[in-house]
Amino acid sequence: MLGKRTGSRHIAVVLLMCLFWYVISSSNNVIGKMVLNEFPFPMTVTLVQLCSITLYSGPFFNLWRIRKYQDIPRPYYYRLIVPLALGKLLASVTSHISLWKVPVSYAHTVKATMPLFTVVLTRVFFGEKQPTLVYLSLLPIITGVGIATVTEISFDMMGLISALISTMGFSMQNIFSKKVLKDTNIHHLRLLHLLGKLSLFIFLPLWLYMDSFAVFRHTAIKNLDYRVIALLFADGVLNWLQNIIAFSVLSLVTPLTYAVASASKRIFVIAVSLLILGNPVTWVNCVGMTLAIVGVLCYNRAKQLTRGREQPTLPLSQTSYVKYSPLEQQADPYYRGSVNGKLSNGLHRTPGNSLLANGSGMPSGTATRLLFV
């Protein structure tokens, strides 16, 4: 059954999920900042989040009947999956370092430079050139981040560098995750779980060597400070939920609408952090933040205009869908992990009617991307 998700019920679902996404994301950032203020171990906070992804995803994804893993050829696994896990690890650690060193509002303003990194990296890795309009749309982003940096009262060089490295890492993940999803048709949530497990496996020895002894000597751990432990637990759960909700929103709307929603989310996070954490800002600093976010919206609009075709706005997303229940009656070769339809390169092809809810098939022309932010 084909159709456009244009009804008022669908609009209400999208708006409700976006609101939930904004609240979860802002809560995650505020709690993360509170944790790092009292427990200054960004590597340990990263470890908790990776553990959360690893521990919660398997049982819940099975409960939700998310399609099982597909076989990925070992050479492909080492060539793309392992580097993706390393990139996720680097981006997560540096993101927490930036959150530790600078205010949430400034860290998220710097993260507005992601389109700049995306343009540069796609040119470096794939030789992809952008139209002049797209390059021009980057100027407000650069200008806004520059103004915010110069006027940031709590500026820290390590915080700035870490935020930039983190943004570059997330941008690389977005680019190469799209390739993995296209090549393997692995469910996007299963890819999140796979990267979380692999990142944890790589990171655990490093954490044991660099952070574990200092952590166990910290007063919060020695004295079993339940407030810090509860904040760490909440941070891990909220980070996991944020990823799940972000991917769910992406499945319901067009890529352009998702990009606009993501930019709006950043505004919400900045506003909430300023309200709750109360870090001092000047009006010029606010102008810089606003200009950077507006630049992101201009970039998204420029990308839309240069595609040469109209994209629907919220939440018109041309989507193929089938009735969810009963799942057992559907002839889905991936149900409960069965696999067929191998491609010539050893990877798998997803049936055309496979859902994002119980498969990862997206209609042709519908871009799918992971956003680990």
Swiss-Prot record:
Q: Which GO terms describe its molecular function?
A: antiporter activity; transmembrane transporter activity
The answer to whether keyword ATP-binding applies is no
- Write out the GO biological process terms: transmembrane transport
Task: Quote the cellular component terms of the Gene Ontology held in the record.
Answer: Golgi apparatus; membrane
Q: How does it sit in the membrane?
A: Multi-pass membrane protein
Compartments, record wording: Membrane
Q: Origin, by domain of life?
A: Eukaryota
**Which of UniProt's keywords are assigned here?**
Membrane, Transmembrane, Transmembrane helix
Q: Transmembrane: present as a keyword of the record? A: yes
Name one matching Pfam family: TPT
Q: Where would one find coiled-coil regions in this protein?
A: none
Q: Which residues cross the membrane?
A: 11-31, 41-61, 80-100, 104-126, 133-153, 157-177, 196-216, 228-248, 256-276, 282-299
Give the family from UniProt: Belongs to the TPT transporter family. SLC35E subfamily.
Please give the PANTHER family that the UniProt record associates with this protein: SOLUTE CARRIER FAMILY 35
Q: What does this protein do?
A: Putative transporter.
Name this protein carries in UniProt: Solute carrier family 35 member E1 homolog
Q: Which organism is it from?
A: Drosophila melanogaster (Fruit fly)
